Amino acid sequence: MGHCTIRKEDGAVYLPAESVRGAFRAQARRIWQTLAWDNHHQNAKTGNQNAARKDDQKKLAGFFKLFGATGWRAPIEVEDFRLVEAAEERPQEFVAIDRFTGGVAGPKKFKAVALWKPKFVGDFTVRTDRLGAANAGSWVWLLLAFTLRDWLEGDGSIGFGRSKNYGGLEAKVEVFGTTPEAAVLRGILGSDGGVLNGAELVGWVRSLESAIGEVA
């Protein structure tokens, strides 16, 4: 079997937290790079992404304050996503091509077994204390909103085979929390006109504009 769904010891299908976190981070990274396209300090892989000593997290390039870096655990915590409804398994055979002859490489054929439209549920937790420790501005909430909106609209993928139409997703998001940030985030994701035209969101936009322009 070349590729199959991941299961726990009891046989339960799940999405590992690492896979969900990685997919979310990759989507957010694309957004960040688009916004900061003309600032190599915020985009380059050689930018400040090492927090080896105490308080170094405050000096990190903006993106890494939110998604973690060497010596700095990301303020976003993700749990394993569990399957909540039975889903049909669909096997598929893949043909391997010999790169020298252009013909079928029989011994290298492989098979995948995927789930058809499975539904998973899990939690993201944003640690506001860690955001504060990194001196991350309110822009982090807007970047989260952008990324969650993409997932709500089906723009994203998780796992193997995106080019083969595997891993597509369409998310549903429910925001819990009583902080002002949670209320605004709920409003953005719910297209609340009052929130979208509110002063709090204007502040987030200005904070993001400032963050992507910083020399880290």
Segment roles from a protein language model:
Residues 1-216:
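Small/polar/charged residue-enriched interaction surfaces, especially the RNA/DNA-contacting tracks
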